Amino acid sequence: MPVVREFLPNDSAQVNVLALVAFEQFKDSYHDWPTFRAKIGNMSALADVGEIIVAEVEGQIVGAVAYVGPGVPKAEFFRPEWPIMRMLVVAPDFRGRGIGRALAQECIHRAKRDGASVFALHTSELMHVALPMYQRMGFKLKSAAPMIHGVKYDVYAKEIDG
């Protein structure tokens, strides 16, 4: 079972490489992959606006996600009072072991901690493993989000009990 813990500054390199490895399978789907790749490869910068949470197995970071709380600046297609989850990534060799779900659940726990009644994310049908997981967890389609480098994204939200 993975250890879910807070991101530490010395985790930056591992988290950035993990994000690149996790998104590599989609490189042919995004227009201007080099620009998008540069953004993905700087996932650790999300620590400046949110809380990065990592999943670790035997000292190796195998999953990560960023939680951005209510009232913190975020993309205009999210309501300001909604906490959100950004860039849930899991190493390909560790998928199917509940790591993504554990990280998402930790974000939901933090949203409850922060007194939120709704928790949101944006994702794409391209994410053929993540999207069904979110739907099984109770996330519902709310609205379209702007395309990202030619890929359609949508906003999903889940009502949560404090």
PLM feature spans:
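A short beta-loop-alpha structural element at the N-terminal edge
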Residues: V3-V17
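A short helix-loop-beta-strand connector motif used in the catalytic cores of GNAT acetyltransferases and
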Residues: M43-V54, I84
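Conserved beta-strand in the GNAT
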Residues: V54, Q60-G69, I84, V89
